[in-house]
Amino acid sequence: MRILGVDPGYGIVGIGIIEVSGNRISHVFHGTIETPKDLPAEKRLKRIYEEFLKVLERFSPDECAMEKLFFVKNVTTAIGVGEARGVLLLALAEKNIPVFEYAPNEVKVSLSGYGRASKKQIQENIKRFLNLSEIPRPDDAADALAIAWCHALQSRARRVTHGEN
Protein backbone atom coordinates (compact mmCIF):
# COMPACT_ATOMS: atom_id res chain seq x y z
CA MET A 1 0.00 0.00 0.00
CA ARG A 2 1.31 3.43 -0.92
CA ILE A 3 0.59 6.19 1.60
CA LEU A 4 0.81 9.90 0.86
CA GLY A 5 1.46 12.08 3.90
CA VAL A 6 0.52 15.74 3.61
CA ASP A 7 1.49 18.64 5.86
CA PRO A 8 -0.92 21.28 4.52
CA GLY A 9 0.18 24.88 4.22
CA TYR A 10 -0.46 27.99 2.21
CA GLY A 11 3.16 28.89 1.52
CA ILE A 12 4.58 25.36 1.71
CA VAL A 13 2.80 22.01 1.44
CA GLY A 14 4.88 19.11 2.73
CA ILE A 15 4.69 15.86 0.76
CA GLY A 16 5.93 12.48 1.99
CA ILE A 17 5.29 9.13 0.35
CA ILE A 18 5.97 5.72 1.85
CA GLU A 19 5.32 2.16 0.71
CA VAL A 20 3.98 -0.45 3.13
CA SER A 21 4.60 -4.07 2.19
CA GLY A 22 3.91 -6.61 4.93
CA ASN A 23 5.87 -5.44 7.95
CA ARG A 24 8.22 -3.30 5.87
CA ILE A 25 7.79 0.46 5.46
CA SER A 26 10.04 2.17 2.94
CA HIS A 27 10.62 5.71 1.73
CA VAL A 28 9.42 6.54 -1.79
CA PHE A 29 9.59 10.34 -2.07
CA HIS A 30 9.50 13.57 -0.11
CA GLY A 31 9.34 17.19 -1.18
CA THR A 32 7.25 20.33 -1.10
CA ILE A 33 4.90 22.46 -3.13
CA GLU A 34 5.77 26.11 -2.59
CA THR A 35 3.95 29.29 -3.50
CA PRO A 36 5.55 32.75 -3.62
CA LYS A 37 4.13 35.31 -1.20
CA ASP A 38 3.76 37.89 -3.96
CA LEU A 39 1.25 35.78 -5.94
CA PRO A 40 -2.44 36.59 -5.49
CA ALA A 41 -4.37 34.11 -3.33
CA GLU A 42 -6.26 32.52 -6.21
CA LYS A 43 -3.03 31.88 -8.14
CA ARG A 44 -1.34 30.39 -5.07
CA LEU A 45 -4.26 28.00 -4.55
CA LYS A 46 -4.31 27.11 -8.24
CA ARG A 47 -0.59 26.31 -8.12
CA ILE A 48 -1.05 24.11 -5.03
CA TYR A 49 -3.92 22.28 -6.72
CA GLU A 50 -2.13 21.73 -10.04
CA GLU A 51 1.18 20.65 -8.48
CA PHE A 52 -0.62 18.33 -6.06
CA LEU A 53 -2.49 16.68 -8.94
CA LYS A 54 0.91 16.01 -10.57
CA VAL A 55 2.08 14.29 -7.36
CA LEU A 56 -1.09 12.16 -7.29
CA GLU A 57 -0.65 11.17 -10.93
CA ARG A 58 3.07 10.43 -10.60
CA PHE A 59 2.91 8.33 -7.42
CA SER A 60 -0.66 6.91 -7.42
CA PRO A 61 -1.12 6.71 -3.65
CA ASP A 62 -3.71 4.32 -2.22
CA GLU A 63 -4.47 6.47 0.82
CA CYS A 64 -3.67 9.93 2.11
CA ALA A 65 -2.86 10.93 5.67
CA MET A 66 -3.18 14.64 6.40
CA GLU A 67 -2.50 16.71 9.46
CA LYS A 68 -5.68 18.07 11.03
CA LEU A 69 -6.01 21.81 11.20
CA PHE A 70 -5.54 22.65 14.85
CA PHE A 71 -5.98 25.83 16.83
CA VAL A 72 -3.57 28.54 15.76
CA LYS A 73 -3.10 32.01 17.20
CA ASN A 74 -2.84 33.74 13.83
CA VAL A 75 -6.27 33.80 12.18
CA THR A 76 -4.83 34.82 8.81
CA THR A 77 -2.55 31.79 8.84
CA ALA A 78 -5.43 29.50 9.77
CA ILE A 79 -7.56 30.82 6.91
CA GLY A 80 -4.75 30.33 4.38
CA VAL A 81 -4.05 26.79 5.59
CA GLY A 82 -7.78 26.04 5.50
CA GLU A 83 -8.00 27.26 1.91
CA ALA A 84 -4.98 25.15 0.92
CA ARG A 85 -6.52 22.10 2.63
CA GLY A 86 -9.65 22.69 0.59
CA VAL A 87 -7.87 22.44 -2.76
CA LEU A 88 -5.84 19.45 -1.54
CA LEU A 89 -9.00 17.65 -0.42
CA LEU A 90 -10.68 18.48 -3.73
CA ALA A 91 -7.80 16.91 -5.69
CA LEU A 92 -7.92 13.80 -3.48
CA ALA A 93 -11.69 13.51 -3.91
CA GLU A 94 -11.34 13.79 -7.69
CA LYS A 95 -8.90 10.85 -7.63
CA ASN A 96 -11.05 8.88 -5.15
CA ILE A 97 -8.20 8.64 -2.66
CA PRO A 98 -9.41 8.13 0.93
CA VAL A 99 -8.19 10.71 3.44
CA PHE A 100 -7.34 10.05 7.09
CA GLU A 101 -6.62 12.95 9.41
CA TYR A 102 -4.32 13.02 12.42
CA ALA A 103 -3.70 15.61 15.10
CA PRO A 104 -0.07 16.67 15.62
CA ASN A 105 0.12 14.94 19.01
CA GLU A 106 -1.12 11.65 17.45
CA VAL A 107 1.74 11.82 14.97
CA LYS A 108 4.24 12.51 17.76
CA VAL A 109 2.97 9.58 19.83
CA SER A 110 3.28 7.20 16.86
CA LEU A 111 6.91 8.20 16.27
CA SER A 112 8.13 8.71 19.82
CA GLY A 113 5.57 7.37 22.28
CA TYR A 114 5.23 10.90 23.64
CA GLY A 115 2.70 13.51 22.48
CA ARG A 116 4.97 16.43 23.30
CA ALA A 117 8.12 15.20 21.60
CA SER A 118 10.27 17.87 19.98
CA LYS A 119 10.34 18.45 16.24
CA LYS A 120 14.02 17.42 16.26
CA GLN A 121 13.20 14.12 18.01
CA ILE A 122 10.46 13.34 15.47
CA GLN A 123 12.78 14.18 12.57
CA GLU A 124 15.55 11.97 13.95
CA ASN A 125 13.10 9.10 14.38
CA ILE A 126 11.67 9.39 10.87
CA LYS A 127 15.24 9.41 9.51
CA ARG A 128 16.06 6.26 11.49
CA PHE A 129 12.77 4.43 10.85
CA LEU A 130 12.96 5.00 7.07
CA ASN A 131 16.73 4.29 6.88
CA LEU A 132 17.49 7.72 5.42
CA SER A 133 21.04 9.08 5.34
CA GLU A 134 19.91 12.47 6.64
CA ILE A 135 16.88 14.22 8.09
CA PRO A 136 14.43 15.05 5.28
CA ARG A 137 14.38 18.75 4.41
CA PRO A 138 12.61 21.06 4.61
CA ASP A 139 10.77 20.48 7.89
CA ASP A 140 7.42 20.35 6.05
CA ALA A 141 8.56 17.28 4.06
CA ALA A 142 9.81 15.56 7.24
CA ASP A 143 6.45 16.31 8.89
CA ALA A 144 4.62 14.81 5.89
CA LEU A 145 6.67 11.61 6.15
CA ALA A 146 5.89 11.48 9.88
CA ILE A 147 2.16 11.82 9.13
CA ALA A 148 2.38 8.99 6.58
CA TRP A 149 4.27 6.84 9.12
CA CYS A 150 1.58 7.52 11.73
CA HIS A 151 -1.10 6.38 9.29
CA ALA A 152 0.82 3.22 8.41
CA LEU A 153 0.93 2.27 12.09
CA GLN A 154 -2.69 3.26 12.73
CA SER A 155 -4.00 1.35 9.71
CA ARG A 156 -1.96 -1.72 10.70
CA ALA A 157 -3.47 -1.53 14.19
CA ARG A 158 -6.98 -1.27 12.71
CA ARG A 159 -6.38 -4.35 10.53
CA VAL A 160 -5.10 -6.37 13.49
CA THR A 161 -8.00 -5.22 15.69
CA HIS A 162 -10.49 -6.21 13.01
CA GLY A 163 -8.78 -9.54 12.30
CA GLU A 164 -7.61 -8.66 8.80
CA ASN A 165 -4.02 -9.80 9.40
UniProtKB/Swiss-Prot annotation:
Annotated binding of Mg(2+) 1, by residue: 7, 140
Q: How is the cofactor bound?
A: Binds 2 Mg(2+) ion per subunit.
- Its signal peptide is none
InterPro entries associated with the record: RNaseH-like_sf, RNaseH_sf, X-over_junc_endoDNase_Mg_BS, X-over_junc_endoDNase_RuvC
Localisation per UniProt entry: Cytoplasm
UniProt xrefs under PROSITE patterns: RUVC
Q: Identify the keywords attached in UniProt to this record, alphabetized.
A: Cytoplasm, DNA damage, DNA recombination, DNA repair, DNA-binding, Endonuclease, Hydrolase, Magnesium, Metal-binding, Nuclease
Q: Write out the catalytic residues in the record.
A: 7, 67, 140
Reaction it catalyzes:
Endonucleolytic cleavage at a junction such as a reciprocal single-stranded crossover between two homologous DNA duplexes (Holliday junction)
**EC numbers, comma separated:** 3.1.21.10
* UniProt entry tagged with the keyword Mitochondrion: no
Q: Which amino acids does the record list as binding Mg(2+) 2?
A: 67
Any one Gene Ontology cellular component term annotated for this protein: Holliday junction resolvase complex
The protein's required cofactor(s) are namely: Mg(2+)
Report the family membership.
Belongs to the RuvC family.
Subunit info here reads: Homodimer which binds Holliday junction (HJ) DNA. The HJ becomes 2-fold symmetrical on binding to RuvC with unstacked arms; it has a different conformation from HJ DNA in complex with RuvA. In the full resolvosome a probable DNA-RuvA(4)-RuvB(12)-RuvC(2) complex forms which resolves the HJ.
PANTHER family, alphabetized: CROSSOVER JUNCTION ENDODEOXYRIBONUCLEASE RUVC
What job does this protein perform?
The RuvA-RuvB-RuvC complex processes Holliday junction (HJ) DNA during genetic recombination and DNA repair. Endonuclease that resolves HJ intermediates. Cleaves cruciform DNA by making single-stranded nicks across the HJ at symmetrical positions within the homologous arms, yielding a 5'-phosphate and a 3'-hydroxyl group; requires a central core of homology in the junction. The consensus cleavage sequence is 5'-(A/T)TT(C/G)-3'. Cleavage occurs on the 3'-side of the TT dinucleotide at the point of strand exchange.
Q: What is this protein called?
A: Crossover junction endodeoxyribonuclease RuvC
Q: What is the lineage of its organism?
A: Bacteria, Thermotogati, Thermotogota, Thermotogae, Thermotogales
Gene symbol of the encoding locus: ruvC
